[in-house]
């Protein structure tokens, strides 16, 4: 897969209350172009927003790309690079035999990541990393904007609990 566009993506999720109003922030960089995306939900969790951010970022890419995706979420990074293989083998159950939380988003992230060559990177949050700080601001602003959009996956997950 050579000759692919090289894209840098930075993502973050935020939740006020956890669960509570939440949002995600994304910074995409291609050559000298930068695009920012953010959205909020009325009731969700921090982990769901940390997962939704890379999903949305990867879904906006129109063609397969070589991606460096940087996040401050160990949950997302370890999940997609390590844990997901066992979950899929076990029918989306954890090593303890429990249903994987946020399975709707894990499945989406798994599917959309198949289109791209991705280098999943972690950066310490709130440590002065320019793009991560910008994503954090975007995510927090989206959560604070009194979003009315429903996170149907979270609502369905709560109904089944």
From Swiss-Prot:
Cellular component, GO, one term: cytoplasm
A GO term for molecular function: nucleic acid binding
Cofactor binding: number and manner: Binds 1 Mg(2+) ion per subunit. May bind a second metal ion at a regulatory site, or after substrate binding.
Segment forming the signal sequence: none
Cross-referenced InterPro entries: RNase_H, RNaseH-like_sf, RNaseH_domain, RNaseH_sf, RNaseHI
Known catalytic reactions: Endonucleolytic cleavage to 5'-phosphomonoester
Ranges where the record places region Disordered: 133-161
EC nos: 3.1.26.4
Residue numbers binding Mg(2+) 2: 12, 136
Keyword annotations of the record: Cytoplasm, Endonuclease, Hydrolase, Magnesium, Metal-binding, Nuclease
Residues annotated to bind Mg(2+) 1: 12, 50, 72
Family (UniProt): Belongs to the RNase H family.
Protein's job: Endonuclease that specifically degrades the RNA of RNA-DNA hybrids.
Name of the protein described by the UniProt record: Ribonuclease H
Source species of the chain: Shewanella halifaxensis (strain HAW-EB4)
Gene it is expressed from: rnhA
């Amino acid at each position: 897969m050579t000759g692919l566009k090289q894209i840098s993506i930075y993502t973050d999720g935020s939740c006020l209350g956890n669960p509570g109003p939440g949002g995600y922030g994304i910074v995409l960089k291609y050559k000298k172009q930068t695009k920012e995306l953010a959205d909020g939900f009325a009731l969700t969790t921090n982990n769901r927003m940390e997962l939704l951010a890379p999903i949305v970022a990867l879904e906006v890419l129109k063609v397969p790309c070589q991606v460096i995706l940087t996040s401050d979420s160990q949950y997302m990074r370890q999940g997609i690079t390590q844990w997901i293989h066992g979950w899929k083998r076990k029918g989306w159950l954890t090593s303890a035999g429990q249903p994987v939380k946020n399975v709707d988003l894990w499945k989406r992230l798994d599917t959309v990541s198949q289109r791209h060559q991705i280098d999943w990177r972690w950066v310490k949050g709130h440590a002065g990393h320019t793009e991560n700080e910008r994503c954090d601001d975007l995510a927090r602003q989206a959560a604070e904007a009194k979003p009315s959009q429903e996170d149907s996956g979270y609502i369905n997950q709560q109904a089944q609990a």
